């Protein structure tokens, strides 16, 4: 590992924490990472403020709660993909159109999985890629059932115009989210990419929170989003049930419902 850069030094120190013992002294971490004690101490101090490491009264260090939180996020993401993949494959076989699975990450959607067929057309989406949530079917499906603060943060960041059909007016955007809450599905009519439309539905977890969304996308003129509503809703409901979701547990945030 290149330890001449700040990032290299950080990762070298993080790699020094091993599973063979619960905590390490500064001298042990310095030796294991190959970094001087002064450098190790400085990085550890920064990690402490970030909750990346904890220092005991005896001066020994162990990994902090922040890494457990981040690990949980990755585990949740992998879990959702694992559960959703068979249903995505069924949708692909049935529709022969592109199928997406995505999560909300800040004001963007982060694509976890994408399945394509031989007749799928080009799309701006890719696995691990990001697109502004407000312009996508999956993003709007999640936002419609998210807390008012989450929706406000997306609007405050600005509603981008990826195409002439993107919704950039906050009032119109809130009205769109209200319709999605009523219908249970979201549509993207060339809002993210010209020539493409889609239908999407949210995936809820055991608390009734929208943790992801799934969509079927295809070219305008070939894909009929309305005809795919039963299929996409059945797929997302099935995934949600695997995550512990019970339909009666779903609640729409009061402030969002009155937007």
Task: Annotate each predicted stretch with a short phrase.
Residues 1-77, 81, 240-245:
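N-terminal helix-turn-helix
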Residues 3-7, 26, 64, 77, ...:
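Short, structured helix-loop boundary elements
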Residues 18, 139, 143, 147, ...:
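Short amphipathic alpha-helical signal-transduction/dimerization elements
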Residues 33, 44, 67, 88, ...:
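Short amphipathic alpha-helical/adjacent loop interface patches that line ligand
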Residues 53-54, 101-102, 203:
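A structural signal for short hydrophobic beta-strand segments in well-ordered beta-sheet cores
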Residues 59-157:
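Amphipathic alpha-helical effector-binding/dimerization core
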Residues 165-238, 242, 258:
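Extended hydrophobic
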Residues 245-259:
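Short, highly charged C-terminal tails/helix-capping segments
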